[in-house]
């Protein structure tokens, strides 16, 4: 396989693929959602997506926990039905078994239906080196085979190709001119080419969507009839499947059927569902090869064993924004999509995952659609941590996170930067390309200048938030003397980005809280929550900052008697209430885990606090009237990934804009799709970030709105920078700033 950098560049340059994937993703999302909603409406909540995924997760967890018993049961039943079951420890073991079977039977031609496990073990290459021809009969797989490619998607192997490209491949392979436009003609050609192979092959190889332990049955779900021909026509049928395909019962398999096609392609079910229990006629042989190849190591890992639930639906690829920009050959190794980043280290080594995992923007969308609730985002971060532990961090990241973990040094350097940044900002709030362009030739400045070509970067504030509010006694208060019985106190955790880059956002938050009659405490010791380091796989500095934050918040609550901790950065909120828990549990730091759990119940994001506390308790003051000549803005809203995918916030901000403020809200297309920020990913892979940003801003402009609102400083930095760099007619605000503008 070509190196990652080469695969990535090819993916970035393939405009046909970008268009195909960007067309498919929204239509898939709509079809999938409509099907699950329709099923639940017709059959009840037991058939909703949430209920079905919980049932299938439970079945898969049972299979993982009791794998040995299920293997024994499956072997007993399959053998009784006339099949031969072989357990292969490794790729070499499985390949050798199949080759020796061919050699004993004198088989030189094999027909195959789609099986990702055969790709995993590189079976075709192994057999071809030994004089045995293996013909892929799945339409997409065969085109990929003819073009010397691997599948770029686990369900739709050539989703990256246009019909014109398919026509070219078929023309080269057949030596005849095949239509580039007529898909029916292309399919007819493939059908004719395969017929003789079906009739003369000595072996058919298939995968399995499930192995049902109670009966020794193989379940296959396909959309093409080739699967049934491969498994029925040749005298020898080999089923190649991992241990992870085991399910206890037929009922569990039915649950999987209800989830698989909807999750994979947005269709109610596959065209063909086939159950095979032993040979179907005298003289027919069925061999079932159960493959380990790293699965035992995965099962032994308390975190990664959850990945063994995967049913290979590829929903995680379908919804993934970076995948849509680079395709599966780059976003993965052999297995593509988010699950590919997770399982690759176990099947093909950590080095094979090192490049692809860097493409993940941590948007968490994959976890929301996974039909078996695999915590894919956190597992990808675990892979990233292992890559960093093995290969180390780039020197610049080591330097940045080393500074970030030292609050006093960070404070000093950011203040110096605020003074020394004038040549790059000219006194504006932005580091702009036109200011940096004259200095591109200086050492180290060209990469920075190129980053600002499409997105202006924020300038450091001359006066950070802590300086702007430090003179106000009620913000520095650390005692409860004179507190009224009905007075509510909140501890405001601003986050480093708001404090150092966007203090005006923090001032707006404080203004809203105080206008609602709250006493606001701003802990001077607050610093970075550690998110940048943790998202980069730097656990050493990330853990240090996590502990700093927990200590600081505990002390602030003790000294102020605050009722809540409010934060207007949903990324920071998710880091503290979700990521810290996983981190401390993983590191077996029980005391820190308990302390974080105590804090988590007191922390709320600004949007939720505004609605669930301030509005619910009728604390919000009267809104001001429009000034003479003032026109109310038309608003569109961007759902930050952490808000909608991690905290489940979907209607709350819209309620504030429409119902509380009374403003017109126009929904943009794909409002909950990542804007492309992704922390340091937007610096490491700017081409991807730029494309996602361009799409987001285009969708915002299509609404005709004049104001783009979100609730996360990271997204706002990205969106503001794109608007500034390209001169777009949009104003970009945090929701707190919008609310502050309309308070009387």
Regions found by a protein language model. Give the residues of each.
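The feature marks the mature, well-folded catalytic cores of soluble enzymes
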Residues: 1-303
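Residue-level signal for inorganic ion chemistry
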Residues: 94, 320, 603
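Iron-sulfur cluster-binding electron-transfer modules in prokaryotic oxidoreductases
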Residues: 97-104, 114-205, 209-222, 229-231, ...
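Gly/Ser/Thr-rich active-site loops/lids in small-molecule metabolic enzymes
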Residues: 227-246, 309-312, 341-346, 651-664
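Ferredoxin-like iron-sulfur electron-transfer modules
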Residues: 290-313, 340-363, 688
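Residues immediately within or flanking Cys/His clusters that coordinate Zn2+
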Residues: 307-313, 317, 357-367, 526, ...
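Iron-sulfur cluster-binding cysteine motifs and their immediate structural context
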Residues: 315-342, 359, 365-386, 575, ...
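Long, charge-rich boundary regions
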Residues: 345-384, 402-416
């Amino acid at each position: 396989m070509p190196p990652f950098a080469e695969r990535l560049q090819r993916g970035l340059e393939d405009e046909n693929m970008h268009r195909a994937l960007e067309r498919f993703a929204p239509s898939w999302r709509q079809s999938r959602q409509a099907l699950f909603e329709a099923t639940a409406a017709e059959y009840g909540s037991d058939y909703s997506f949430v209920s079905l995924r919980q049932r299938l997760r439970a079945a898969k967890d049972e299979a993982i926990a009791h794998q040995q018993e299920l293997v024994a049961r499956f072997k007993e039943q399959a053998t009784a039905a006339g099949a031969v079951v072989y357990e292969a420890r490794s790729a070499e073991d499985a390949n050798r078994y199949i080759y020796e079977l061919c050699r004993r039977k004198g088989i030189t031609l094999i027909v195959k239906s789609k099986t990702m496990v055969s790709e995993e073990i590189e079976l075709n290459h192994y057999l071809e080196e030994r004089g045995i021809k293996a013909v892929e009969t799945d339409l997409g797989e065969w085109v990929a085979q003819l073009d010397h490619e691997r599948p770029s998607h686990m369900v739709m192997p050539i989703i990256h190709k246009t019909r014109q490209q398919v026509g070219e491949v078929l023309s080269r392979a057949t030596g005849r001119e095949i239509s580039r436009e007529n898909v029916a003609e292309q399919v007819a050609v493939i059908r004719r080419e395969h017929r003789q192979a079906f009739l003369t092959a000595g072996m058919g190889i298939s995968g399995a969507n499930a192995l049902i332990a109670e009966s020794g049955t193989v379940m296959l779900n396909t959309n093409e009839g080739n699967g049934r021909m491969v498994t029925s026509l040749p005298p020898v049928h080999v089923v190649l499947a991992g241990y992870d395909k085991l399910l206890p019962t037929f009922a569990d398999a039915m649950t999987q059927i209800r989830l698989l096609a909807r999750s994979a392609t947005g269709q109610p079910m596959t065209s063909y569902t086939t159950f095979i229990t032993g040979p179907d006629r005298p003289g027919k042989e069925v061999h079932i090869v159960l493959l380990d190849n790293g699965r035992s190591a995965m099962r032994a890992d308390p975190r990664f064993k959850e990945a063994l639930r995967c049913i290979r639906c590829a929903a995680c690829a379908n919804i993934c924004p970076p995948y849509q920009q680079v395709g599966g050959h780059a976003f993965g190794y052999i297995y593509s999509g988010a699950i590919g980043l997770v399982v690759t280290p176990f099947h093909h080594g950590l080095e094979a995952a090192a490049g692809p995992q860097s493409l993940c923007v941590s948007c968490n969308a994959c976890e929301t659609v996974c039909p078996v609730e695999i915590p894919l985002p956190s597992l990808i971060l675990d892979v990233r941590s292992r890559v960093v532990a093995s290969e180390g961090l780039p020197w610049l990241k080591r330097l940045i996170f080393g500074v970030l973990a030292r609050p006093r040094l960070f404070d000093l350097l950011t203040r110096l930067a605020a003074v020394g940044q004038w040549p790059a900002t000219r006194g504006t709030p932005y580091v702009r390309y036109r200011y940096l362009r004259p200095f591109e030739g200086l050492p180290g400045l060209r990469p920075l200048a190129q980053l600002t070509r499409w997105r202006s970067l924020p300038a450091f504030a001359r006066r950070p938030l802590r300086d702007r509010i430090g003179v106000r006694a009620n913000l520095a208060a650390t005692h409860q003397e004179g507190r009224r019985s009905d007075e509510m106190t909140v501890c405001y955790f601003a986050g480093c980005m708001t404090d150092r880059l966007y203090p005006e956002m923090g001032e707006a938050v404080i203004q809203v809280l105080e206008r609602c009659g709250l006493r606001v405490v701003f802990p001077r010791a607050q610093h970075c929550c550690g998110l940048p380091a943790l998202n980069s796989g730097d656990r050493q500095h990330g853990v240090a900052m996590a502990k700093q934050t927990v200590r600081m918040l505990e002390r602030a609550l003790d000294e102020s008697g605050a009722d809540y901790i409010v934060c207007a950065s949903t990324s920071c909120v998710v880091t503290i209430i979700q990521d810290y828990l996983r981190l401390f549990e993983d590191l077996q730091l029980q005391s820190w885990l308990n302390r974080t759990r105590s804090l988590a119940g007191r922390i709320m994001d600004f949007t939720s606090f505004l609605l669930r506390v301030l509005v619910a308790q009728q604390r919000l003051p009267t809104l001001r009237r429009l000034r003479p000549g003032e026109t109310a803005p038309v608003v569109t809203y961007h759902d930050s990934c952490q808000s909608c995918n991690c905290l489940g916030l979907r209607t709350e901000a819209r309620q504030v804009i429409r119902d509380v403020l009374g403003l017109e809200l126009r929904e943009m297309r794909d409002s909950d799709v990542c804007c492309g920020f992704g922390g340091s990913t937007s610096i490491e892979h700017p081409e991807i970030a730029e494309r996602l940003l361009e799409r987001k801003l285009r969708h915002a402009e299509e609404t005709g709105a004049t104001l783009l609102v979100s609730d996360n400083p990271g997204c706002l930095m990205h969106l503001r920078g794109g608007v500034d760099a390209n001169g777009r007619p949009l104003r970009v605000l945090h929701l707190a700033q919008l609310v502050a503008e309309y308070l009387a």
